[in-house]
C-alpha cells in the first residue's frame, strides 16, 4: 500500500497520510514545525506506537530546523523536544525516539545546529527503515504460529498504518500469507475511533486478504461459535512483567479468549517493551476528548450534558498472553525472566 509516512526533501517536511479520513478519502498532512508534529500526534493524523515513534524521530529533526537563527537555540530546542515527547503519554515508542535523539545530541558534543540536524535526519531515516524490517521479522515469527485455515481476530489497527509499514499484528497475518497459508481476519470495529472498521479493513481489503468487520460486542458470540482460532493484537507498551497496554477493549478480548481456549498473542517490536515500568497498572492511560464518544463525525449521538469515559488504552495482564511476538523471536512465560534475558542478550 501507499507509504503513509514520507519525508519530502523538496518541502523539508514530513508528509503523513491523514488517517482521520480513511477509508473515504486520502488526504495528506504536512509537518514542518514542532507544533505540526504535536498536532499530528494528538489528533491522530498518525497513530500506532511504532508509527508514532518514527514520526517523533523526524519531528526532532524538524524541531531543530525550526530554531535555526535563534540566539539560544539549545534551550529552544530542548523545549521543542519536550513538547514532542509529552504529546501522548502511553506509547513508549514516542519517548524512546525522542530520548534516542537526545542521546545522540549528548554524544555529538559541541556540534553546530546544522550538523546536529543532519545527524538526526540520518538517524530518523534509519529508524524508519528499521521499523519496516522489524515488522517483517515479527511477521515471519508470528506467521509460523498461525495454522492454515485460521481465522484471526484482531483489535484496533496494528498494521502498516500503525507502523512504518507491514505491521505488527497484521504483519503476523501477512507473514502467514507469505508462508502460503490461507487465513482470514475478523477486525473488531474498535470504538470510538473505529480503527478496526476504518483502517484494518481498509489495508487488508486492499491487500486481498479476507476480512470481516465485527461489532466490538460480538466477540463472545463469534468465539463461542468457533469462528475464531487465534487472537493477535499489537501493543503501545509492554511492561517489564509482560503486561501489554493496547487499545481500550483489548483486555476484554483477552478475557474472552481465555474463556474459550483461544491463544491470545501480542505482536510488538522490542523497543515497545519498557523494562523500566514494572506492570501495566503503572502505565499512564490517556484520557481523550469526550467528543470522540459523543459524536460520530459531526453528528452528536448522546444527549447534551451527559458525561462519558474515553480511556484510550487498557492493560492486559500477562497471564492472558500466550506469547509476545517480537523481531527477535517469540517470548513465552514467565515473561519477567524472558524480558530480562532479551535485554541482557541485546
Curated annotation (Swiss-Prot):
The disulfide bonds in this chain are none
Residue numbers binding substrate: 47-49, 88, 195, 246-247
Q: What class of enzyme is it?
A: isomerase
The alphabetized UniProt keywords are: Amino-acid biosynthesis, Isomerase, Methionine biosynthesis
Per the record, the pathway is:
Amino-acid biosynthesis; L-methionine biosynthesis via salvage pathway; L-methionine from S-methyl-5-thio-alpha-D-ribose 1-phosphate: step 1/6
What the protein does comes down to: Catalyzes the interconversion of methylthioribose-1-phosphate (MTR-1-P) into methylthioribulose-1-phosphate (MTRu-1-P).
Task: Quote the SUPFAM superfamilies the UniProt record gives.
Answer: NagB/RpiA/CoA transferase-like
**Which example biological process does GO assign this protein?**
L-methionine salvage from methylthioadenosine
The record ties this protein, via Pfam families, to:
IF-2B (PF01008)
What is the name attached to this protein's record? Methylthioribose-1-phosphate isomerase
Give the catalytic activity: 5-(methylsulfanyl)-alpha-D-ribose 1-phosphate = 5-(methylsulfanyl)-D-ribulose 1-phosphate
EC numbers, comma separated: 5.3.1.23
Tell me the active site: 236 (proton donor)
The GO molecular function terms of this record are: S-methyl-5-thioribose-1-phosphate isomerase activity
Site residues by UniProt (Transition state stabilizer):
156
Q: InterPro entries per the record?
A: IF-2B-related, IF-M1Pi, IF_2B-like_C, Initiation_fac_2B_a/b/d, M1Pi_N, NagB/RpiA_transferase-like
Q: Which family does it belong to?
A: Belongs to the eIF-2B alpha/beta/delta subunits family. MtnA subfamily.
Amino acid at each position: 500500500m501507499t507509504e503513509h509516512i514520507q519525508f519530502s526533501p523538496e518541502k523539508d517536511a514530513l508528509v503523513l497520510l491523514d488517517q482521520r479520513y480513511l477509508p473515504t478519502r486520502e488526504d495528506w498532512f504536512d509537518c514542518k514545525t514542532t507544533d505540526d508534529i504535536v498536532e499530528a500526534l494528538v489528533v491522530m493524523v498518525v497513530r500506532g506506537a511504532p508509527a508514532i515513534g518514527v514520526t517523533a524521530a523526524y519531528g526532532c529533526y524538524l524541531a531543530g530546523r525550526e530554531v535555526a537563527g535563534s540566539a539560544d537555540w539549545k534551550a529552544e530546542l530542548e523545549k521543542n523536544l519536550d513538547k514532542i515527547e509529552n504529546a501522548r503519554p502511553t506509547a513508549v515508542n514516542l519517548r524512546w525516539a525522542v530520548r534516542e535523539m537526545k542521546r545522540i545530541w549528548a554524544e555529538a558534543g559541541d556540534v553546530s545546529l546544522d550538523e546536529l540536524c543532519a545527524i538526526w535526519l540520518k538517524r530518523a531515516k534509519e529508524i524508519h527503515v528499521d521499523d519496516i524490517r522489524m515488522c517483517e521479522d515479527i511477521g515471519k515469527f508470528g506467521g509460523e504460529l498461525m495454522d492454515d485455515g485460521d481465522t484471526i481476530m484482531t483489535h484496533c489497527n496494528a498494521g502498516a498504518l500503525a507502523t512504518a509499514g507491514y505491521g505488527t499484528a497484521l504483519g503476523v497475518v501477512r507473514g502467514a500469507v507469505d508462508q502460503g497459508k490461507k487465513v482470514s481476519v475478523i477486525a473488531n470495529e474498535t470504538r470510538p475511533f473505529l480503527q478496526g472498521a476504518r483502517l484494518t479493513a481498509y489495508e487488508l481489503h486492499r491487500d486481498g486478504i479476507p476480512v470481516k468487520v465485527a461489532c466490538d460486542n460480538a466477540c463472545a458470540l463469534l468465539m463461542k461459535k468457533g469462528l475464531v482460532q487465534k487472537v493477535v493484537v499489537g501493543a503501545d507498551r509492554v511492561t517489564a512483567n509482560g503486561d501489554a497496554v493496547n487499545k481500550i477493549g483489548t483486555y476484554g478480548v483477552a478475557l474472552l479468549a481465555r474463556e474459550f481456549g483461544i491463544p491470545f498473542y501480542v505482536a510488538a517490536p522490542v523497543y515497545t517493551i519498557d523494562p523500566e515500568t514494572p506492570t501495566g497498572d503503572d502505565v499512564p492511560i490517556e484520557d481523550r476528548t469526550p467528543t470522540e464518544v459523543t459524536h460520530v463525525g459531526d453528528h452528536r449521538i448522546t444527549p447534551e450534558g451527559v458525561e462519558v469515559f474515553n480511556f484510550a488504552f487498557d492493560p492486559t495482564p500477562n497471564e492472558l498472553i500466550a506469547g509476545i511476538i517480537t523481531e527477535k523471536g517469540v517470548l513465552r512465560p514467565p515473561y519477567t525472566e524472558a524480558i530480562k534475558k532479551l535485554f541482557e542478550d541485546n
